[in-house]
């Protein structure tokens, strides 16, 4: 399955269809229709949160899905598919790719990422695993553990990389990531314009994930209203 999945997303746009509990569009049904609209617009894949949303999306589209499970724990800042329990639950949906936080931060219940990846590969040998990284150190760490894909998802969202943007200094972080690993790099995180998406692919990223700029109307509206307020 791995090679065919990778071919399907190569050089393309993956749209992240997520709405958390406190957001107006929080609904598996709505996310499934959002995914359908994205695919009709040319998306080659979907990134989705929770098994419920994933299954609804699977009933609407036939493209590779990057599955995650966002869950907060009191003893850790890691929240993207943080423990073996969540990783297993997402794998059980049959998604082609499962993404998880691959930072060097302490995980909930002191679980070890190396142990999680080793255990889940035995249970789901045909599933691809994507590392959501923040820093370059995270990239090296994820690479050493044997993740199939490296994502820049958490760049700008960890304490170490707070307030940084993937386009800063002419995409210097992305260029460093691409030099640091031979694994396929998935550009993700603050890719909020078509030009940024084109640029990261031109640099050599395997695919690009775009979320809020496409699927969060409240964020899109805010960008317009903030600009209008400058008049």
Swiss-Prot record:
EC nos: 5.1.3.9
One GO term (biological process): carbohydrate metabolic process
Quick one: which pathway? Amino-sugar metabolism; N-acetylneuraminate degradation; D-fructose 6-phosphate from N-acetylneuraminate: step 3/5
What top-tier enzyme class does this entry carry? Answer: isomerase
Known InterPro entries for this protein?
A: Aldolase_TIM, NanE, RibuloseP-bd_barrel
Which GO molecular function annotations are given, in alphabetical order? N-acylglucosamine-6-phosphate 2-epimerase activity
Q: Which domain of life is it from?
A: Bacteria
The protein's name is Putative N-acetylmannosamine-6-phosphate 2-epimerase
What gene makes this protein?
nanE
């Amino acid at each position: 399955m791995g090679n065919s999945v990778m071919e399907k997303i190569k050089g393309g746009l993956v749209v992240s269809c997520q709405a958390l509990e406190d957001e107006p569009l929080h609904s598996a049904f709505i996310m499934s229709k959002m995914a359908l609209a994205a695919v009709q617009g040319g998306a080659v894949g979907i990134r989705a949160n929770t098994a419920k949303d994933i299954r609804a999306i699977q009933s609407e589209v036939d493209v590779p899905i990057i599955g995650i499970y966002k869950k907060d724990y009191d003893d850790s800042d890691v929240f993207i598919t943080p423990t073996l329990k969540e990783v297993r639950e997402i794998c059980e949906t049959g998604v082609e790719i499962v993404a998880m936080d691959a930072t060097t931060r302490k995980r909930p219940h002191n679980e070890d990422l190396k142990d999680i990846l080793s255990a889940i590969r035995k249970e789901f040998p045909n599933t691809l695993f994507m590392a959501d990284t923040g820093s370059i150190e995270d990239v090296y760490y994820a690479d050493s553990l044997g993740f199939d894909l490296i994502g820049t998802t958490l760049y700008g969202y960890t304490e170490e990389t707070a307030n940084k943007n993937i386009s800063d200094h002419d995409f210097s972080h992305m260029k460093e990531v691409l030099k640091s690993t031979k694994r396929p790099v998935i550009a993700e995180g603050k890719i909020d314009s078509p030009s940024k998406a084109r640029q990261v692919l031109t640099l050599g990223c395997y695919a690009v994930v775009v979320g809020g700029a496409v699927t969060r109307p409240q964020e899109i509206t805010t960008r317009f209203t903030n600009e209008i307020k400058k008049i």
